[in-house]
Curated annotation (Swiss-Prot):
This is Protein FAM81A. The keyword Cytoplasm applies. One of its GO terms (molecular function) is molecular condensate scaffold activity. Residues 275-301 are annotated as: Disordered. The keyword Chaperone does not apply. Highly expressed in brain (at protein level). Interacts with DLG4/PSD-95, GRIN2B/GLUN2B and SYNGAP1; the interactions facilitate condensate formation. InterPro entries: FAM81.
Amino acid sequence: MHLRRVRTMPRHSQSLTMAPYSSVSLVEQLEDRILCHEKTTAALVEHAFRIKDDIVSSLQKMQNKGGGDRLARLFLEEHIRNITAIVKQLNRDIEVLQEQIRARDNISYGTNSALKTLEMRQLSGLGDLRGRVARCDASIARLSAEHKTTYEGLQHLNKEQQAAKLILETKIKDAEGQISQLLNRVDLSISEQSTKLKMSHRDSNHQLQLLDTKFKGTVEELSNQILSARSWLQQEQERIEKELLQKIDHLSLIVKENSGASERDMEKKLTQMSARLDKIEESQRRNAEGQRKPEEEKVHGRISKLELQMTEDMKEMKAEVNAGFTAIYESIGSLRQVLEAKMKLDRDQLQKQIQQMQKPESSM
């Protein structure tokens, strides 16, 4: 007797392709063991029937031959033992199979419940996925609309950026032209100031040379006047000495002519003459010293006046040169400050325009 079991899958496993791997493998193992037990029981039953057939045939032969009771009894006992053993084995196998069937039913119930829960989860997941897909479609449509608007805005911003770039380039060119003009003006002013400085330096040098020549001329004139005064004094002294010598000679002649006069009168006259000569010499010396002192004082006064005038002229020229230098430095400093302020303003304007252009780019 052959027993045959067909392996069937549950409905949920047929409807759903996914199941827990551990439960499926355990069910398959149980089914394999049941098939193996069925095969063994079928083999034992076949073996018992074969023994039965052998016994029946042997009994028939013994009955035909006669005197086979004892042997038949032995065969029957052997057959009964075999059958009881087979029945016991079958009972044990049936119990094992029942337990395995109960375990398989429990496992199949668990797998069915798990599959049902999985199916419910999958259905809920599918509904959730459908809702998500619908929401994704709506968000995709919204994003496509936003993308379109942003693309149009980007194109508009690109056009504005190009226009602003052109305006900024023109402004930069204008600023560069203004800066170049200012630099040219500064160069011209610096060259003019340098030429003025050179001219003032030349004029100051020329005036100093003129003052030097004037001072030298006055010194030479004073020295000539001093020399002329000294020569006049020497001439006057020589003239007075000649007059005195002439008078002395005249007196000596008179003395020789009047040798007959008394010695007292001669002595008196000589003393008077010597006194007169002394007085004349003192007066002449006083007159010469008096004339020399005012002339020397005049010369010293003129020299001091010339020195004071020259020092005052030098101070005035130095003050004028310093004033010119300070005015030039002040004008250069003011020009530099104006240029730096203008360049700073232009730089700030350019930086503001660049930042204004960079803001839409960063937002883009």
